[in-house]
């Protein structure tokens, strides 16, 4: 017994094997950017003029099909935020319209748009395309545009809607085997992207940047919408680069890449998450705040997971729980830096929240950081002491280590619709929050190169699942892919259900976008976009480097 106690005592002083993270590939790429106010003003004036014409076009659309295709195009081009009132008005008309005469393309488009706009619509609308054997009619297999529309619609389904799972299988099979050479370029490119990233799960502004390039080559394009989308993206890209410049300079003042060499230097990648949450111009605080929230999460994760001993981790958790600057003196030097970094961000946050009428958010932000520390500490003990908890215990802890609560808290001052009641709702751990949290964890654990090696052993949810259910690694990975699919269905259902809880669309979209970013950030073959800069590179280049060509 005494020997066992000595072993445990020694173990608590052992540092985990340190992962050497790749350096930032961006260094000072964005820190010296200077916004041209005159150029922005010119863009703004052009946007306003073109918006008036586009608004007239939208309001002049009379048939449901005209309305739906135009709304879909505006959303794909990243322009819908300019026309929210008009689009919601048209969505109500579409919802009220009879759909008996709609073909597969129109039926599926209507279904998807209504659900994405939080309207209750039954999947029974697809019954007319089912044969006597309960399968989709094979005659549909030659209709590529209809198949694509059904494929996209099927990804807004719920768990209980078996017809939509059948739709995914049916459409994917036929789209993957389709001869697309004779199809219009726009259809070919849409199919290619959808099979990689279904539209409902795609990174909205990254998709918009891609779609502008595709739309430009389409013979049926509308020149007005093309020009508006280009000027709009140019305006937003300049805004993003200005925000990223400010953020980079702030980050450099901390010099954490030298002071905390075990931690990932990822300010640009953190800002990508901010753009993913809300890309629209009015959400500048959200993007900047989210980036700082991500950096807190990343540094805490690396401190617990990549450097701290168990004793140091326990001490840090206790000190953070007291939330007192004077307590920093109890910490090792490197932890003092981490602690002061967190408190500095919080103090600025507290001031911002007060200015923006969101003082009630500050205690919640503090609470989520403490909660995150406790969850990271628990996870590190499992890893270092080689304790495999039950899969359910791991999942419960993972809801916290997903960082979703700290991330959401970090942006509250920039969300007009958030109230104390919103925070109370989130603290009740609603399904929308827990499901989006688990999307990130499931992708984390199924991403092959993301599985963290500890002294030659791997410890992730896959390990817990393999042990508890006697599965091979491949079987566990397949099970997790299934969990991702089922969890998305829960998100889809709760996204609509929030309209019954007095939770605004702005908040529901925020959680939905978290899941979308997770989907875009993890790869089964290349790892994750925060740990490996090469995975995030394409998105960074598309959003902040490559200029729109007019």
From Swiss-Prot:
A Pfam family per the record: Terpene_synth_C
Q: What's the EC number here?
A: 4.2.3.47
Lineage, top-rank taxon, reads: Eukaryota
Pathway assignment: Secondary metabolite biosynthesis; terpenoid biosynthesis
Q: Which cofactor does it need?
A: Mg(2+); Mn(2+)
Describe the pH profile of activity. Optimum pH is 6.75-7.25.
Residues involved in Mg(2+) 3 binding: 452
Q: Where in the cell is it found?
A: Cytoplasm
Q: Name one GO molecular function term.
A: terpene synthase activity
Q: What is the effect of changing residue 531 to L?
A: Loss of activity
**Which keywords does this Swiss-Prot/TrEMBL entry list?**
Cytoplasm, Lyase, Magnesium, Manganese, Metal-binding, Plant defense
One Gene Ontology biological process: defense response
Sequence positions that bind Mg(2+) 1: 301, 305
> Which CDD domains does the record cross-reference, listed alphabetically?
Terpene_cyclase_plant_C1
GO CC terms for this protein? Answer: cytoplasm
Where along this sequence does the record place binding of Mg(2+) 2? 301, 305
How and how many cofactors are bound, per the record note?
Binds 3 Mg(2+) or Mn(2+) ions per subunit.
**What reactions does this protein catalyze?**
(2E,6E)-farnesyl diphosphate = (E)-beta-farnesene + diphosphate
Keyword S-adenosyl-L-methionine part of the UniProt annotation? no
Where is the motif (DDXXD motif)? 301-305
Additional remarks: The protein CAH10289 described in PubMed:16083926 is inactive.
Which family is this sequence assigned to?
Answer: Belongs to the terpene synthase family.
Protein name, UniProt field: Beta-farnesene synthase
Q: What is the lineage of its organism?
A: Eukaryota, Viridiplantae, Streptophyta, Embryophyta, Tracheophyta
């Amino acid at each position: 017994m005494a020997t066992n106690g000595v072993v445990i005592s020694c173990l608590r002083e052992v540092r985990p094997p340190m992962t050497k993270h790749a350096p930032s590939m961006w260094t000072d790429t964005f820190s010296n950017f200077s916004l041209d106010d005159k150029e922005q003003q010119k863009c703004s004036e052009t946007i306003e003029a073109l918006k008036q014409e586009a608004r007239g076009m939208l309001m002049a659309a009379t048939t449901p099909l005209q309305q739906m295709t135009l709304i879909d195009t505006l959303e794909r081009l990243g322009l819908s935020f300019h026309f929210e009132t008009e689009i919601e008005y048209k969505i109500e008309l579409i919802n009220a319209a009879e759909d008996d005469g709609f073909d597969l393309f129109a039926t599926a488009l209507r279904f998807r748009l209504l659900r994405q706009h939080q309207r209750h619509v039954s999947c029974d609308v697809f019954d007319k395309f089912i044969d006597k054997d309960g399968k989709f009619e094979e005659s549909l297999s030659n209709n590529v545009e209809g198949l694509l529309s059904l494929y996209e619609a099927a990804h807004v389904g719920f768990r209980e809607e078996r017809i939509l799972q059948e739709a995914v299988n049916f459409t994917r099979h036929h789209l993957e085997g389709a001869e697309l050479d004779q199809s219009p370029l726009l259809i070919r490119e849409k199919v290619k992207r959808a099979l990689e990233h279904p539209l409902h799960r795609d990174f909205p502004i990254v998709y918009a940047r891609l779609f502008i390039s595709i739309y430009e080559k389409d013979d049926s394009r509308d020149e007005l919408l093309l020009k508006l989308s280009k000027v709009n993206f140019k305006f937003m890209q300049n805004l993003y680069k200005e925000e990223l410049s400010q953020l980079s300079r702030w980050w450099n003042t901390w010099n954490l890449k030298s002071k905390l060499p075990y931690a990932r230097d990822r300010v640009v990648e953190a800002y990508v998450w901010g753009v993913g949450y809300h890309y629209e111009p009015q959400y500048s605080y959200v993007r900047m705040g989210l980036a700082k929230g991500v950096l807190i999460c990343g540094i805490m994760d690396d401190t617990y997971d990549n450097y701290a001993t168990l004793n140091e981790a326990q001490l840090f958790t206790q000190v953070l729980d007291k939330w007192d600057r004077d307590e920093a003196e109890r910490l090792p030097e490197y932890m003092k830096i981490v602690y002061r970094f967190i408190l500095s961000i919080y103090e600025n946050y507290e001031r911002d929240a007060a200015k923006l009428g969101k003082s009630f958010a500050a205690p919640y932000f503090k609470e989520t950081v403490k909660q995150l520390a406790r969850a990271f500490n628990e996870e590190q003990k499992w890893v270092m002491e080689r304790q495999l908890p039950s899969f359910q215990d791991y999942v419960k802890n993972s809801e916290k280590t997903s960082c979703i609560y700290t991330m959401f808290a970090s942006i509250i001052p920039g969300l007009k619709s958030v109230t104390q009641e919103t925070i109370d709702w989130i603290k009740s751990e609603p399904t929308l929050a827990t499901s989006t949290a688990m999307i990130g964890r499931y992708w984390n654990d199924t991403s092959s190169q993301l599985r963290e090696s500890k002294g030659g052993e791997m410890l992730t949810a896959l390990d817990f699942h393999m042990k508890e259910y006697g599965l091979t690694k491949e079987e566990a990975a397949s099970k997790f892919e299934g969990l991702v699919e089922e969890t998305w269905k829960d998100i889809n259902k709760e996204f609509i259900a929030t309209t019954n809880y007095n939770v605004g669309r702005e908040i529901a979209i925020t959680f939905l976008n978290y899941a979308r970013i997770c989907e875009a950030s993890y790869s089964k073959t290349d790892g994750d976009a925060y740990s490996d800069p090469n995975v995030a590179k394409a998105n960074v280049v598309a959003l902040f480097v490559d200029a729109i060509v007019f």
